[in-house]
Structures are given as structure tokens and as C-alpha cells.
């Protein structure tokens, strides 16, 4: 059972965070909020998402698992404007969820959870390099790199105490270094890995709105991005596998 109302902007932000990686997912409702954990079809990127009940104007739910077409929900919530409230209502064992926004009333058929990939386990990975940077700065560097390449190297230089992002195209090169004065914090541990910009572009759009993004790195290891949404009443973690660098 779920019965809730929430600001349209807050819920749109939440749905966009999920839709950056997957078109559908299993949403878990509970008395304290909504969560999901999902991996993309290529097993390259994963999201762990939490939206606390405090993010909602009203919230009442029991423990359940529902299959949601995130792409469809994203299009529906685009109907909402600033200051609009979204109403969500789902009865026990129901196959449709009632959604109301900006005077529009939808009856959305839920997906069969048996057709959706099971929630992935949270991997235990040691990522000693840690940087906290503004989401806007991070996204700007990603966008700049995407102009000339489809991949980007991220790393930490402990000697210079900098966080750097480097991209190489066929004939072009771009590098951006962030010193300690441009970062919220930095753990000066050597780290460097290469990542696909196809994934980072979509992640970057979501992270651009975050005041702070924690970036955790290793050497030829995945990268973990952690940041808050919904005024601190929600949290998102992205985990992205590295690309193998050619010799």
C-alpha cells in the first residue's frame, strides 16, 4: 500500500536520477520511504537510491515491492510545474497506481516484478581515493571531455594534491585539474581509472544539481559517486565500472 503526495520538482529529480541508468526498476516501499537498487542491462553501472518519507508532504506506506516503468513515469511527471503536488496511490495487491499531477489523473499499470532484473548485491570494493566536488564543476568537466572523446580518465595526484580528468580524442586532448582550493575535500591517495562518457553524460546531468558529490576512486577500479537529493531527504549512489585501457 502506498498513499503519498510530494512536490513535483522533488519527485522529478528522484525519477531522473534513476532513469539516467535504467528504464525500469523494482521500487521498495516501507514505512520510512522508498528505495531501489538496479543495474543497467550491460552490467556496467549501478544505482542505489533512497527517498525518505521526510521528502514527501504526506506519506503512508507498507512494505511492498512494485515494478515501475521509469521512462513512462518521467514523461508523466514532466506535466507538473513548479509548486505542483504529485499524488500517488496504490492499494494492497493492486496492479495499477493512481497518479495525479497538475489536474491530470493517470491510472498506471505496474510491471510484473518477475520480468525485472533482481536487485543487485552491493559490491564490496576498496576505493581509497576520495574527493568531494561540486556537482556543477564535475558535470562541466564531463561535458567538456565529451566534445572530443567517448572516454575519460579520472584520477588523484597525491603529490600535487589534485583531482584530474583527462580525455584523448583522435587528434585532440583536454585536461582539467582541480586543486584543493576548488574541492570540498581530498584524500591524497594515488588513483586513476578510465570510464565511458556515454554513462557519465547522463549521470552528470543529475549530479550537476548537487551541492556536493563524493567521488571515490582506485587504480583501474570502478568509481562511486554519492550525493544527496530532495534537500538532504534522499540519497543516490552511482557505481560505474572502468574501461580497459589499451596498451
Swiss-Prot record:
Record bears the keyword Lipid metabolism: no
InterPro entries found in the cross-reference section: DNA_clamp_sf (IPR046938), Pr_cel_nuc_antig (IPR000730), Pr_cel_nuc_antig_N (IPR022648)
Keyword tags: DNA replication, DNA-binding
A Pfam cross-reference name: PCNA_N
Coiled coil, from the record: none
GO biological process: leading strand elongation; regulation of DNA replication
GO MF terms, alphabetically ordered: DNA binding; DNA polymerase processivity factor activity
Record's subunit section: Homotrimer. The subunits circularize to form a toroid; DNA passes through its center. Replication factor C (RFC) is required to load the toroid on the DNA.
Protein task: Sliding clamp subunit that acts as a moving platform for DNA processing. Responsible for tethering the catalytic subunit of DNA polymerase and other proteins to DNA during high-speed replication.
PANTHER family, per database record: PROLIFERATING CELL NUCLEAR ANTIGEN
Family: Belongs to the PCNA family.
UniProt protein name: DNA polymerase sliding clamp
Amino acid at each position: 500500500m502506498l498513499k503519498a503526495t510530494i512536490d513535483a520538482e522533488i519527485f522529478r529529480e528522484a525519477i531522473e536520477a534513476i532513469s539516467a541508468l535504467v528504464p525500469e526498476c523494482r521500487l521498495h516501499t516501507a514505512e520510512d520511504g522508498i528505495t531501489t537498487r538496479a543495474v543497467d542491462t550491460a552490467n556496467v553501472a549501478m544505482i542505489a537510491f533512497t527517498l525518505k518519507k521526510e521528502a514527501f508532504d504526506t506519506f503512508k506506506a507498507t512494505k511492498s515491492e512494485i515494478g515501475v516503468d521509469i521512462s513512462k513515469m518521467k514523461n508523466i511527471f514532466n506535466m507538473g510545474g513548479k509548486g505542483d503536488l504529485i499524488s500517488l496511490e496504490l492499494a494492497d495487491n493492486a496492479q495499477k497506481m493512481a497518479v495525479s499531477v497538475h489536474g491530470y489523473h493517470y491510472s498506471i499499470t505496474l510491471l510484473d516484478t518477475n520480468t525485472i532484473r533482481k536487485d543487485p548485491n552491493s559490491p564490496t570494493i576498496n576505493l581509497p581515493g576520495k574527493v568531494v566536488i561540486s556537482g556543477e564543476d564535475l558535470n562541466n568537466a564531463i561535458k567538456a571531455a565529451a566534445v572530443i572523446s567517448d572516454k575519460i580518465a579520472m584520477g588523484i595526484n597525491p603529490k600535487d594534491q589534485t583531482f584530474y580528468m583527462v580525455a584523448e580524442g583522435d587528434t585532440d586532448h583536454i585536461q582539467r585539474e582541480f586543486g584543493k582550493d576548488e574541492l570540498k575535500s581530498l584524500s591524497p591517495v594515488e588513483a586513476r581509472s578510465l570510464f565511458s562518457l556515454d554513462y557519465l553524460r547522463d549521470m552528470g546531468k543529475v549530479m550537476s544539481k548537487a551541492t556536493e558529490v563524493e567521488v571515490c576512486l582506485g587504480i583501474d577500479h570502478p568509481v562511486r559517486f554519492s550525493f544527496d537529493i530532495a534537500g538532504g531527504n534522499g540519497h543516490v549512489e552511482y557505481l560505474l565500472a572502468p574501461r580497459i585501457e589499451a596498451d
